[in-house]
Amino acid sequence: MDDIIVGKLFKEIRESKNLTQEDVANALGVGRNAIVRIEQGTRKISADELIRLEKLYNIELHSFVNVGISNHNVKGIILAGGTGTRLYPITEGTSKQLVPVYDKPMIYYPLSVLMQAGIKDILIITTSEDQASFKRLLKDGKQFGINLNYVIQPSPDGLAQAFILGEKFIGDSPCAMILGDNIYYGNGLEKELQKSIENALDGYATIFGYKVKDPERLGIMEIDDFNNVLSVEEKPKFPKSDYAITGLYFYPKGVSEIAKTIKPSARGELEITSLNDCYLKNNKLKSSILGEGYTWFDTGTFSSLLDASNMIRTIEENKNIVVCCPEAIAYNNGWISEEELIEAGNLMKKNSYGQYLLELSQKKNENEAQKVKKLSLF
C-alpha cells in the first residue's frame, strides 16, 4: 500500500480516542511536529505507521484507508463518446454526458464511482466535437486531486474499443471502465468496488449485474445460486436470466491485448460481451450483483433522465447531502486539502452545491467526522 495523506480526519479520530499529539508521536517514534504536519495534510503516513496505531489504540485501519484512498495502480476509463441520438434534440448541441442530472453534469456520476474506488488516473474518451467542452469543465482533474487524460474516439465501434484506444494510457495496469451515462446508487457500493479492485489485482475481471424487466434489450449474465457467472449474452432473443450487465467493468492487466483479439459482431462492433466471454472461458470472470437497496440508471432516454434527476433530488433534500460530489470524495480521500475544498465552495456559494462544500469543511467533532466519510457515498 502506498503512503497516504489523511489530514483532518486523522486529527478528528485521534481526538475521539482522547489521544494527544505527543501520545501519537511517541507511539510512532517521531517528533510532535511530524504529527502536526500529518494533520495539516503536508506529511504522508505509511501503512506500517497506521498498523502500529491500529494495534496500540484499537483504531480500525479502515478509518483511514477506506476504499476511496488510492492504494493500488488500477486506472480508469470513462466512455463519453457517441452521438446521444436517443436524447435529440437535447444532445444536438452538446454531449449527452454533459447534460445535467439534477444539480450536476451527468459525467460527475461515473467520475465519482471511479474516485470512490480509489482510482486517480482516469482517461475520458470523447468525440472530437465534444472534447473541448469536457476539458473546459473538468480540466486536468487537479481540483479533484486526480489526473485526467483525454482521447478522441474516431467512430463508435463498440465498448471494447475503449481498451484499444486507451492502450497506451493503461499500460501494464489493471483497468476499470464505466459508461458515461450510467448512475449507481446504494450504500454498499464502496464494498463492491473494493472487491472488484482486489479481483483485478488478483487477475480476475468483474462485471456488475442488476435485475431488469426487459433483459432482451441488454447484455445479460447467467449466474448460479452462488453468483458464479455461467454465460454472458448480448441482447439475446430468449434471455437465460433477467440480470443485465451494467456499464461498470473491472479488468486485470493485459485487457488491451485481449480486446485486440475480438472480432466485430454482426453489427460491426467490438462487443464488451465478447471481451467478458474471453475471461469467462478462462475462468477469470466474477460477478457483483446489485440487489435490493441499489438503483442503476442508464440515462439515455428522456424518462430515465427525468427519473434519475428526481431520485437524486429526493435523496439530497431528505438527507441534506450531495450525491456523487467529486470535491467531497476527494476531500474525504485526502486528495485535496480543506483550503482547496473551501475555495471550491466559495466559487459556488450562491447555490446548494457550493454551500454543501463549505458545510463539509466545518465538521468538527467525532460524530460529524464519521458523517464526513459517508456524505458522498452512494
Language-model-detected regions and their locations in the chain:
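DNA major-groove recognition helix of helix-turn-helix/homeodomain DNA-binding modules
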Residues: 46-63
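A short, Lys/Arg-rich alpha-helix, primarily the initiator
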Residues: 1-16
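Conserved beta-loop-beta/alpha segment of the NTase-like Rossmann-fold superfamily
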Residues: 134-135, 139-225, 250-253, 259-262
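Short alpha-helical DNA-recognition segment
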Residues: 18-37
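N-terminal glycine-rich phosphate-binding loop and ensuing alpha1 helix
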Residues: 69-138, 146-148, 153-155, 189-191
